[in-house]
């Protein structure tokens, strides 16, 4: 059996929520922004169509193209309601934004023709199209922005379903993860966690690493499986690995002197790394799934975090775990952009730090 087959655990298919796009009016009622904006749009449309019909029924001249703009606006309002009821707003954001932009041009053009016309009936029609233009501009700002934008997050914070997940932020996350993983295997995320926990943090992935103010643990299991198996490793990386090995050996010797009960643990640390970091037959204690975290005790998960958004683990990365929105997770390491965490069902792995928020007490779990 090759070393890589020992080190790499078999990827597990993450559990994903079933996406239900059936017609549900509660999807529309649960969003205060949708209810308020669409209700105002309907009222404005009624004012515009009423003023237009009254003005056209008299001998006053009425711009004919305004009729198409009013009908087009009605189609936009109906489409928005359907997208919300079927929970398809995020799937058609580009279409919604561009179609509303066209309606904005139609309404502003009609307002230009009606606002300077004489007669109270045309004044009512002009007031309706002006209100529709304002609402369309607000819609363009909202639907044209990503869910991670400040305005969208503030608006979605009033929704019963909470803040919507950002497809852009999620795709950038995974693209960065794949790019880092293809550069040097195990130099990112889990491997950096092992280096950081040993007190020797370096900049491997192009992003500045912070020195931790505390050490949660130095476990032989956490360091298992990260021996250097790359024949073309650069001298700089070898220097870091040698320094890390010396620190681990020093810690092992100190433990042997002070506590004889840890002899087995120190033996595992010595056997995990090859002395010259060659590609020889190096034994590893990596488990079949996430052995990296299998021996971490409950005492090491000293933090609690609340999931701000749902997250689906990457199929290509067996170390990531999925979680639901508002789920409470136990966290053992809060340094860097990826944290070690444990779910309530005992599943352990790494999670993106910007998808969760640390909580101090039980009262914050229900916010």
From Swiss-Prot:
Coiled coil: none
GO biological process, one term: regulation of actin filament polymerization
Family matches, as SUPFAM superfamilies: SH3-domain
Subunit organization: Forms homooligomers. Interacts (via the SH3 domain) with PBS2. Interacts with FUS1, STE11, STE50 and RNA polymerase II.
Organism from which the protein derives: Saccharomyces cerevisiae (strain JAY291)
InterPro entries: SH3-like_dom_sf, SH3_domain, Sho1_SH3
Name of the protein described by the UniProt record: High osmolarity signaling protein SHO1
Residue intervals on the Cytoplasmic side: 1-32, 87-93, 144-367
Keywords assigned by UniProt, alphabetized: Cell membrane, Cell projection, Glycoprotein, Membrane, Phosphoprotein, SH3 domain, Stress response, Transmembrane, Transmembrane helix
Extracellular face residues: 54-65, 115-122
């Amino acid at each position: 059996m090759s070393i890589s087959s020992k080190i790499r655990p078999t990827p597990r298919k993450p559990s994903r929520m079933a996406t239900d796009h059936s017609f549900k009016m509660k999807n529309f009622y649960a969003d205060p922004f949708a209810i308020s904006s669409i209700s105002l749009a309907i009222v404005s449309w009624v004012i515009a169509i009423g003023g237009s019909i009254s003005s056209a029924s008299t001998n006053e001249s009425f711009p004919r193209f305004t009729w198409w703009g009013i009908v087009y606006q009605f189609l936009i309002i109906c489409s928005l309601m359907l997208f919300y009821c079927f929970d398809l707003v995020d799937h058609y954001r580009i279409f919604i934004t561009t179609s509303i932009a066209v309606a904005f041009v139609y309404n502003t053009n009609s307002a230009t023709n009606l606002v300077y016309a004489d007669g109270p009936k045309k004044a009512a029609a002009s007031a309706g199209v002006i209100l529709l233009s304002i609402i369309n501009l607000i819609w363009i700002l909202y639907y044209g922005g990503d869910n991670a934008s400040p305005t969208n997050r503030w608006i979605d914070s009033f929704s019963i379903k909470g803040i919507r997940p950002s497809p852009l932020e999620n795709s950038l996350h995974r693209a960065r993860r794949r790019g880092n993983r293809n550069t040097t295997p195990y130099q990112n995320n889990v491997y950096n966690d092992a280096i950081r926990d040993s007190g020797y943090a370096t900049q491997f992935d192009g992003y500045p690493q912070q020195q931790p103010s505390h050490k949660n643990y130095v476990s032989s299991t956490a360091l298992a499986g990260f021996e250097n198996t790359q024949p073309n490793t650069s001298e700089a990386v070898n220097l870091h690995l040698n320094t890390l090995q010396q620190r681990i050996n020093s810690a092992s010797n100190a433990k042997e002197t002070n506590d004889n009960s840890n002899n087995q643990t120190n033996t595992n640390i010595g056997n995990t790394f090859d002395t010259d970091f060659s590609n020889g037959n190096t034994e590893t204690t990596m488990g079949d799934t996430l052995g990296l975290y299998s021996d971490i005790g409950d005492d090491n998960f000293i933090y609690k975090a609340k999931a701000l958004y749902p997250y689906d683990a990457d199929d290509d990365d067996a170390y990531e775990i999925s979680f639901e929105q508002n789920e409470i997770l136990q966290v053992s390491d809060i340094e860097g952009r990826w944290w070690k965490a444990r779910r309530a069902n005992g599943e352990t792995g790494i999670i993106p730090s910007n998808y969760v928020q640390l909580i101090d007490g039980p009262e914050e779990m229900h916010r």
